[in-house]
Amino acid sequence: MNVSWVMMMNMGISAVIALFLPIVLLVVWKVKNRGIRMIPFLVGAGVFIIFALFLEQICHYFVLSRVSPLSEYVNGHIWAFVLYGALAAGVFEETGRFLAFKTVLRRSKGKETAITYGIGHGGIESILVVGISMISSLILVVAINAMGGVENYVALVPAEAQGVLRENLNTLLLTPAHTFLLAGIERISTIIFHIALSVIVFFAVRGEVYQNLMHLYFVS
């Protein structure tokens, strides 16, 4: 089985979006707001790495991966799995935002700080979670085609590992091609969402949520 050019093209498009959208967004934001500092961007990226890619994964290990009655229940009930995933992401990422604005960025004023932070938080997620994943997948499928198909590629590994590798590759190749394109497009709305959440948490920490909501009410 060879990989279709449509799938490879969609992987490439998503990789470009995921890798370069955060950079373009930061450059445009920096050009339009020359006085902003890069510190909030770096803090946002660092918070995502620490809270989402490190601390949250430790929690996932104990709740999802480690064999226990809890993991069996959560993995065995789709509603519990979805609820846990949503709560875990919310708790860890919003706690990270809160602590960042409360400590490292406590002296930073104005919504520009929150927006710059949001670009860093959502941008590094886009690059690490989707961008690198798409690049890795694209390299893999190009190698499969260069080898003449899945079976020739699988033959390169030891016999005891071939079954698992073949199953994983077939799962990847049977994924609808448009799914890979959607992964990149979804990053656009996700980064916007991260920026919006960062602004909300920023004003919450500053105690200005109510005032801003009232201002919005009277303006509208």
Task: Give the positions of each predicted feature.
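Hydrophobic alpha-helical segments at protein termini of multi-pass membrane proteins
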Residues: M1-S220
